[in-house]
């Protein structure tokens, strides 16, 4: 039976970076520069405005919100209504910074485009960046093809990142010092389909069975994938799916950020405001974190 999607917020420019934290749903709206919280009835609050475009979100152990500032390639904190620079990522990021996952110790892993998508530059690899609390940023992994959505397993031992332009999910062991090792392919999405309609990973989230829900804008769907690449389920959307997160009281509500926009045309996204937050109920709960 097809699952039924419901729109709980529309009129957005480009929703991204969805997170479920302390029984609330949060996300960034790129081109309005706003970070929102939102409930299941569509009631929302603007948490903060980020002048250089917010993207990935996370929280420190003390509850301080972390926000990736895209265009100036910085990591910011937001606490007591004060937006503060934590780290300058510009030396390690090839172009705009994007998604982020933060572990229970406050270590932040941050992706970036690697090349200027707006100018049509040639695709090239880049770094996945690590920012430890109170330390300078460093390279967690190099030669990553557009590191995007990222999750950490419930035991805190494995990080999995979506490489958008390689159409794969790549896993690493997380060492005691938060560095990464033992790189391997977790799922090759190009090998997961036989019709040539290859999903590409954008935002994603982990469920309690260890499968990952992956938003794929290229195929207008979110897919549930297990290690090895088997696609367990697909939920189609009318436009493009850019990110997803499990939340709700039982952690079985899948929040999906959708938009007609391509992600490389800010003017169109601002003009059309086709972005939505859609929800759908699924069978397996999340784990309360990406």
Give the ranges of each region predicted by the language model.
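A short beta-strand motif characteristic of beta-propeller blades
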Residues: 4-9, 42-49, 83-90, 136-142, ...
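Short loop/turn segments immediately following beta-strands, especially the blade-tip
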Residues: 172-179, 282-287
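Flexible "stalk/tail and boundary" regions
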Residues: 22, 38-40, 61-62, 78-89, ...
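Blade-level signature of beta-propeller repeat domains, shared across WD40, Kelch, NHL, RCC1
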Residues: 246-290
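Beta-rich, blade/repeat-based domains predominating
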Residues: 9-23, 50-69, 91-108, 114-115, ...
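A short loop-to-beta-strand structural motif that recurs across blades of beta-propeller domains
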Residues: 34-36, 74-76, 126-129, 168-170, ...
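Loop/turn-rich, solvent-exposed surfaces of beta-rich toroidal or solenoidal domains
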Residues: 167-168, 172, 187-227
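Conserved beta-strand positions in repeat-built beta-propeller and related beta-rich domains
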Residues: 11, 26-31, 65-72, 108-120, ...
């Amino acid at each position: 039976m097809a699952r039924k999607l419901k729109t709980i917020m529309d009129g957005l420019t480009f929703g991204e970076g969805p997170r479920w934290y302390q029984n609330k749903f949060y996300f960034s709206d790129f081109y309005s520069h706003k970070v929102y919280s939102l409930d299941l009835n569509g009631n929302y609050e603007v948490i903060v405005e980020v002048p250089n475009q917010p993207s990935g979100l996370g929280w420190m152990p003390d509850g301080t919100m972390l926000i990736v500032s895209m265009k100036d390639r910085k990591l910011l904190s937001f606490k007591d209504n004060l937006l503060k620079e934590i780290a300058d990522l510009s030396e390690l990021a090839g172009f705009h910074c994007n998604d982020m996952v933060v572990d229970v110790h406050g270590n932040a892993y941050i992706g970036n485009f690697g090349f200027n998508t707006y100018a049509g530059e040639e695709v090239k690899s880049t770094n996945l960046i690590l920012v430890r609390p109170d330390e300078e940023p460093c390279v967690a992994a190099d030669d990553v093809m557009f590191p995007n959505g990222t999750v950490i397993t419930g035991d805190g031992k494995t990080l999995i990142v979506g490489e958008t332009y390689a159409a794969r999910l790549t896993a690493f062991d997380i060492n005691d010092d938060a560095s990464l090792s033992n790189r391997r392919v977790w799922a090759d999405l190009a090998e997961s389909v036989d019709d040539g309609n290859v999903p590409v990973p954008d935002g994603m989230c982990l469920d309690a069975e260890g499968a990952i829900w992956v938003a794929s804008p290229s195929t207008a769907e979110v897919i549930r994938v297990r290690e090895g690449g088997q696609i367990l389920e697909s939920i189609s959307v009318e436009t493009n799916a850019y990110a997803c997160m499990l939340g709700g009281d039982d952690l079985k509500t899948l929040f999906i950020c959708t938009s007609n926009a391509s992600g490389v045309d800010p003017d169109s996204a601002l003009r059309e405001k086709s972005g939505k937050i859609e929800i759908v109920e699924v069978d397996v709960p999340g784990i309360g974190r990406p």
